[in-house]
Amino acid sequence: MSAIGDKNQFRIIVGSYEHNILCLSLDIPNQKENDAAKTPHFMPIFHFQAHSLSIKCLAVSRRYLVSGSNDEHIRIYDLQKRKELGTLLSHQGSITALQFSHPASSSEDAAVSKGSKNSKWLLSASEDHKIMVWRVKDWETVGTLKGHTARVNDVDIHPTNRIAISVSDDHSIRLWNLMTLRNAAVLKLRKYNTNGTCVRWLGAKGDYFAVGLRDRVLIYETGSAKVFKEIVFQRKTLMHIETHILPFDNKEYLSVGISDGNVHFYPCEELFEKVEENEKQEDDDDKEDISPAFSLLGHTNRIKDFKFYTNEFGTYLVTIGSDGKIVVWDMSTKEQVAVYDCGERLNCLTLCDESIEKYNTMKKRDAETADIGDQSEVESDTEELKKIMFGEKKKLNKKKRKQLKKSKVSVELE
């Protein structure tokens, strides 16, 4: 991810219960500038009603923006041209999650993604118990991942793009082989009375994954497929989880959004530490809450979604809440950078580069083209105007022409 020139800019796209999509460009001034110019500036890019019901999820891959809604539709937009490309209609239930595959970043990934810098697949989850796999090149359906018997709440793709993981209201976690589009494994949540609401892979190689329940986070080891660590929240509801490498210590953190407006940060290194068998038995008898390394409070009520953005200027956390506010944090200082009140009930969020939009591909008209184009048909054709006003002149034959010449009278003055 990169900024434009010397400007620290990126775009924030949010979806709301009011069926709208709002895109804002955030300009964060550099510290070298004078005090008057140090105030961050939000500039609206577009704001429109995208669906007939509330928007549940958003995802971005380079130039493409996709949105999922309770109206069972997935809409595709080209951010470079600010144009809607179409609608995906295969689901028969509300869209609950959208996830693009990872762009190829190594030789191993390039073999999977065929060297393309853009995402190859889009995964969409729905209340119809299905996960659809779409080919981004032509937006055709590659296949359907079937196996869940209830609403699919979330889905995430492994860093290798070969495996996906999903959680559902059927009280299970499923692993999918994206090479064969078949179910690879099923994990049951037998010891817990709540369903998984969100899931994320952990570690650079995806050796672990985190499953968020209503009141706790379960840390699984991928190899053994067993829970070896739990983060419990007393009298609080988990809303969302993400993972990212933070700049102040260059380590990966698991971030957890809570219903009280807080985002808690847990170092993944500590979560990955093995627990001895005797200690594990004691923990089962008397569990102690794992305390976060630090927390950020930016909302008065529950957090709905949050994402991280990294460019040459630093790493930023963007959170949205039911209070309608967008809060931006600088993770190097752990301080708020900017706040924007949308006046709507926000539900989902995604981020993209400011350079995503190519102005030369947009439909623009210069002054001369605009002047010509704005003229009416009558104004642009003077000959047609004369015909309408005075009638069309009839062509004269040779005899009539001679008669006109003879009838002409010449007058000379003495």
Curated annotation (Swiss-Prot):
Residues the record lists as N-acetylserine modifications? 2
Q: What is this protein called?
A: Protein MAK11
Q: Tell me yes or no: is Cell membrane among this UniProt entry's keywords.
A: no
Location comes to: Nucleus, Nucleolus; Nucleus membrane
Q: Record keywords: GTP-binding included?
A: no
Residues with Phosphothreonine modification: 382
Additional remark text: Present with 3730 molecules/cell in log phase SD medium.
Instruction: Give any single GO term for biological process.
Output: maturation of 5.8S rRNA from tricistronic rRNA transcript (SSU-rRNA, 5.8S rRNA, LSU-rRNA)
Q: What does this protein do?
A: Essential for cell growth. Plays a role in assembly of 60S pre-ribosomal particles in the nucleolus. Also required for replication of the M1 double-stranded RNA of the L-A virus. This latter function may reflect an enhanced requirement for free 60S ribosomal particles for the translation of viral mRNAs which lack poly-A tails.
Task: Specify the species.
Answer: Saccharomyces cerevisiae (strain ATCC 204508 / S288c) (Baker's yeast)
Assembly and partners are described as:
Associates with 60S pre-ribosomal particles.
Q: Name one GO cellular component term.
A: nuclear membrane
Q: How does it sit in the membrane?
A: Peripheral membrane protein
Extract the PROSITE patterns matched here: WD_REPEATS_1, WD_REPEATS_2, WD_REPEATS_REGION
GO-annotated molecular function: protein kinase inhibitor activity
Matching PANTHER family, A to Z? P21-ACTIVATED PROTEIN KINASE-INTERACTING PROTEIN 1, PAK1 INTERACTING PROTEIN 1
Give the InterPro entries listed for this entry.
Answer: G-protein_beta_WD-40_rep, PAK1-Kinase_Regulator, WD40/YVTN_repeat-like_dom_sf, WD40_repeat_CS, WD40_repeat_dom_sf, WD40_rpt
Judging by the UniProt lineage, the source's domain of life is Eukaryota
Q: Where are the WD repeats?
A: 50-78, 90-135, 147-177, 189-221, 238-267, 298-330
